[in-house]
UniProtKB/Swiss-Prot annotation:
Organism classification: Bacteria, Pseudomonadati, Pseudomonadota, Gammaproteobacteria, Enterobacterales
Matching NCBIfam families: mutS1, PRK05399.1
Keywords, ordered alphabetically: ATP-binding, DNA damage, DNA repair, DNA-binding, Nucleotide-binding
Cellular component terms (Gene Ontology): cytosol
SMART domains, alphabetized: MUTSac, MUTSd
Taxonomic superkingdom: Bacteria
Descriptive protein name: DNA mismatch repair protein MutS
Gene: mutS
UniProt-recorded Gene Ontology molecular function terms: ATP binding; ATP-dependent DNA damage sensor activity; damaged DNA binding; mismatched DNA binding
């Protein structure tokens, strides 16, 4: 608001003075200032809104001799404009007229009633139906981070403490917050620089004592031990800032936020940012949602179920007991899925309706939907009654009865209420006697007017006389211009038209006052009764939220039961013995988009068979085979059935993928640098229980550099880390690894040549591939025949040279470049030296000692 800084308020109208005072309280965000039927913006706000929303920029009055820039949007369309701004990461303060223009002396009283920010929206029109909308806060202390997320549209409050930047980057990608709060002194700006909705906050908002006080006050507790977060010092700093920001923007209490949960890495399968991206879990590599795992698995019938399924996909569980309970529920629900899903569909997005109820922003149709949801509960219970499994019984016990609340809403709210309570007609007839009386008075107007019109027409003999109502002038008696000279003296002219005159008489004026008063009284009483409904519903909020969560889970499990039936999935066996054994495995996404039948393949990994060296032609299916292994393991760890004939899945702590690569131009990193960064992350963090996918490692550099790196990485993964590894490569030299190392096995994807054409069999066979078929693939891609012919000649020359050259022998021992288990003694000694504490003589002695170590 630079243009309005340092202005003399006395030179402005009282209305603009009021604007400046309100804008000073919200200098960083857009202020929507209500003026009649419009929300107006001024100065820099107007210019910015004009650009962002493509609305007209006009002028109003003057400041310092210059016209004041102004832009506006109609009040009835404001939600559409807010939705667009929120998607761009903007925040908006909504300033409403709260005074009565009729009784106000000077400008109507106004105040900011809510602040709409990307991370704190709860309005249905502003939210993506099937995506969580998270507000997040981040804090850093050295290498470690504190991270908190809040979904204000459900009350879900989570914290974690990522140990390093890689883990923090993975958390940011997993949660994908709409708005991120960070402290002024935040060190790792490169982690968050490219995100929308960044909000810089003062350091004092992250004070740990203030955070504890805020959280205890919110939850009504003396300490946070019961939530398991008492010792999470970094996470609590982030949580305190986040909660304060949520309260400041909502301008109301947040009763639906009733607890906080600590998320620990070891609770789920850990996946870094590259793995989530490469496996295309909820977003494909182009940024869309088509052809992702979620797109295949998500046929949920409620939006809250869809959001829960995506959370499960992004955080696969390692709690075997919980996963087996999900499997049991899916097996049981397969019998009743077609009968149960129609009732679940009618429940709707109860989770977000309850959040709006808690924030007291629920609209009449929200209450009607809540009533409709309650009406489904008996049928849902009836459908579930025959199922005798612990997991289903648990869900049934969590779904409340709420017969009294259903009865209340059936009596109180009309069948099809209007959008807004201010439109009237929300409260049902018969619910409140006084309201019925006021409405009868207001609604009786038409009968009275008909009687008055007949009486006056007959009494005066004026056949053109009629009685009507106009929104500007109120009630009137209209007589044609030709008969207007015949009206009696007590007819007072109210309006002149081209062909008629309109009059008012004392009797009609008295009735008009009575009707308008009754309409106003009815609307005021209706608003009071509507607020009273909130007071009657909110004491049950905790049980309602619990029921909504149970119904969302029931929707997810019923959906997974339907998917298992429809897509021919089987229940995997979750074992405590290390290894992965899959018979007839299929890629869940690729098999859905292929026109021809998908070729299933087996996979066997164990401590005795821990690495597969995978060779075969481009387009042969190596990447698909590797990804399908990771996706089957992931699906098993969300409790889902899997695309296979049979599957036994042992303990898996992490999934890593190093597949495909592209230049990271924004960070100035080449394809090869991206590849090596991801590889380094795997070599540092993988364990013997990790599943590692390595696809074409080393191809981004020269042949011998690449081969050397690939060999050394394979050795390190097989010998030192002993991870379960699928290692796809075009370096045929690597197929000699099984001869040199235990637990390494060659497999290949088959292909057949027929003359100049090639047929990919897509089947995995034991042993190494005989050739790469690169030229055949190039021909398939449409490379000109003369180029293919020349390439065949050159290939023969190179193969002859290679066979004759003594340098073609690769010594595996020399190529283990990265397998440096033992650090250099000289480096260790250097790291232990404090140069500032040495005398010149001591420094010289150290030089001699280091020389001996080399």
């Amino acid at each position: 608001m630079k243009e309005s800084e340092g202005i003399d308020l006395s030179t402005h109208t009282p209305m603009m003075q009021q604007y400046f005072r309100l804008k000073a309280e919200h200098p960083e965000i857009l202020l929507f200032y209500r003026m009649g039927d419009f929300y107006e913006l001024f100065f820099d706000d107007a210019k910015r809104a004009s650009q962002l929303l493509d609305i007209s920029l006009t002028k109003r009055g003057a400041s310092a001799g210059e016209p004041i820039p102004m832009a506006g949007v109609p009040h009835h369309a404001v939600e559409n404009y807010l939705a667009r701004l929120v998607q761009m990461g903007e925040s908006v303060a909504i300033c409403e007229q709260i005074g009565d223009p009729a009784t106000s002396k000077g400008p109507v009283e106004r105040k900011v009633v809510r602040i709409v920010t990307p991370g704190t929206i709860s309005d249905e029109a502003l939210l993506q139906e099937k995506q969580d909308n998270l507000l997040a806060a981040i804090w850093q202390d050295g290498r470690g981070f504190g991270y908190a997320t809040l979904d204000i549209s459900s009350g879900r409050f989570r914290v974690s403490e990522p140990a390093d930047r890689e883990t923090m980057a993975a958390e940011l990608q997993r949660t994908n917050p709409a708005e991120l709060l960070y402290p002024e002194s935040f060190e790792s700006m490169e982690l968050i620089d490219n995100r929308h909705g960044l909000r810089r906050r003062p350091m004092w908002e992250f004070e740990p004592d203030t955070a504890r006080q805020q959280l205890n006050l919110q939850f009504g507790t003396r300490d946070l031990t019961g939530f398991g977060v008492e010792q999470a010092k970094l996470a609590l700093r982030a949580a305190g800032c986040l909660l304060q920001y949520a309260k400041d923007t909502q301008r109301t209490s947040l009763p639906h936020i009733r607890g906080i949960t600590m998320e620990r890495q070891q609770d789920g399968i850990i996946m870094d940012a590259a793995t989530r991206r490469n496996l295309e879990l909820t977003q494909n590599l182009s940024g869309g949602v088509e052809n992702t795992l979620a797109a295949v698995l998500d046929c949920t019938v409620t939006a809250m179920g869809s959001r829960m399924l995506k959370r499960w996909i992004h955080m696969p569980s390692r709690d075997i007991d919980a996963l087996k309970q999900r499997q049991q529920a899916i097996s049981a629900l397969q019998e009743i899925t077609p009968d149960l899903q129609p009732y679940l569909r009618q429940v709707g997005d109860l989770e977000r309706i309850l959040a709006r109820l808690a924030l007291r922003t629920a609209r009449p149709r929200d209450l009607a939907r809540m009533r409709h949801a309650f009406q489904q509960f008996p049928d849902i219970r009836e459908q579930l009654a025959p199922l005798d499994t612990d997991s289903v019984r648990r869900l049934v016990s969590l779904i409340g009865q709420f017969d009294e609340l259903r009865d209340l809403l059936e009596r109180a709210v009309v069948e099809a209420p209007p959008v807004l309570v201010r439109d009237g007609g929300v409260i049902a007839p018969g619910y409140h006697t006084e309201l019925d009386e006021w409405r009868a008075l207001a609604d009786g107007a038409s009968d009275y007017l008909d009687r008055l019109e007949i009486r006056e027409r007959e009494k005066l003999g004026l056949d053109t006389l009629k009685v009507g109502f106009n929104g500007v002038h109120g009630y009137y008696i209209q007589v044609s211009r030709g008969q207007s000279h015949l009206v009696p003296i007590h007819y007072v002219r109210r309006q002149t038209l081209k062909n008629a005159e309109r009059y008012i008489i004392p009797e009609l004026k008295e009735y008009e006052d009575k009707v308008l008063t009754s309409k106003g009284k009815a609307l005021a009483l209706e608003k009071a009764l509507y607020d009273e409904l909130f007071d009657l519903l909110l004491p049950h909020l905790a049980e309602l939220q619990q029921s909504a969560a149970a119904l969302a889970e029931l929707d997810v499990l019923t959906n997974l039961a339907e998917r298992a039936d429809t897509l021919n999935y089987v229940c995997p066996t979750l074992s405590d013995k290390p290894g992965i054994k899959i018979a007839g495995g299929r890629h869940p996404v690729v098999e859905q988009v292929l026109r021809e039948p998908f070729i299933s393949n087996p996979l066997s990994l164990s401590p005795q068979r821990r690495m597969l060296i995978i060779t075969g032609p481009n387009m042969g299916g190596k990447s698909t085979y590797m990804r399908q292994a990771a996706l089957i393991v992931l699906m098993a760890h969300i409790g889902c059935f899997v695309p296979a004939d049979q599957a036994v899945i042992g303990p898996v702590d992490r999934i890593f993928t190093r597949v495909g690569a592209a230049d990271d131009l924004a960070s100035g990193r080449s394809t090869f640098m991206v590849e090596m960064t991801e590889t380094a992350n795997i070599l540092h963090n993988a364990t013997e229980n990790s599943l590692v996918l390595m696809d074409e490692i080393g191809r981004g550099t020269s042949t011998y550099d690449g081969l050397s790196l690939a060999w050394a990485c394979a050795e390190s993964l097989a010998n030192r880390i002993k991870a379960m590894t699928l290692f796809a490569t075009h370096y045929f030299e690597l197929t000699t690894l099984p001869e040199k190392m235990e637990g390494v096995v060659n497999v290949h994807l088959d292909a057949r040549e027929h003359g100049d054409t090639i047929a990919f069999m897509h089947s995995v066979q034991d042993g190494a591939a005989s050739k790469s078929y690169g030229l055949a693939v190039a021909a398939l891609a449409g490379v000109p025949k003369e180029v293919i012919k020349r390439a065949r000649q050159k290939l023969k020359e190179l193969e002859t040279l290679s066979n004759n050259a003594s340098s073609s022998h690769i010594d595996g021992a020399q190529l283990a470049l990265l397998n440096t288990d033992e650090p250099s003694p000289a480096i260790e000694a250097l790291e232990a030296i404090d140069p500032d504490a040495l005398t010149p003589r001591q420094a010289l002695d150290w030089l001699y000692q280091l020389k001996k170590m080399l």
